[in-house]
Amino acid sequence: MISSPVSPRLANIRLHPIKSLDPVHVKEARIGPGGGLAFDRAWALYSVDGEWVNGKRTAAIHLIRAAYAPDVSAVTLSVPGDSRNIPTKTFAFPGDTAAASQWFSDFFEQSITVRHSSEGFPDDNIASGPTIVSTASLQAVCDLFPGMTIDEARQRFRTTLEIEGVPAFWEDQLFGEEERSAVRFRIGEVNFEGSNPCARCPVPPRDPRTGEIMHGFQKIFSDYRRSHVPNWTPESRFDHYYRLATNTRVASTETGKLLHVGDSVLS
């Protein structure tokens, strides 16, 4: 149950069309066949060992810039300041995987295969819906680290849906005390089930544009999270406090429905 007396609304929608690369801000997004947002994490990079090439494994990926057409029909890849003069190139999205594979292979100096999935490549295959965080939660993170902007916090945590008009960690209300006790809620016309607090990976401590590690990030964040647990948070779900945002599940009945910036969040 969403219990706090607030008026939550969808403030931002961010797609990450290529897993681990830059996001694109959109005003509306459709629920895709896998329960995530259409075009979110639709491309993933694979090395010859069949593993993802992503920010968790390869810090150099942070050096790549991706800029998308307004309708996400094309992506322009570049590496500003690269001494090897990797060319800036534009690829049709999501169809031009072969040419993009060659570009990434040249950059990483190893064989890279770009794969496309209309269902996306989520980290959590069970709670594969959009991740939800509040603007206030991201601002709370910024306040811990002098000089960090809210846009930088967005890039570090890479969530898809951002809610305004609520206090920090309000999104903790969107999962229950038990793993199987999903919390049902709606954003606009789309029905969701809140699943669990999202455990964070090695990516948030890294500068999203250089990959440089901010030492102490995880401890500072976790200590703050532990000492600032709201009374609505199901704390039993925190085996550790390096968690931010809520993972969701979206039923196949919601496929094709649209989310719009400004949509209300309802219990």
What are these regions (language model features)?
Residues 1-267:
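Metal-cofactor-dependent catalytic cores
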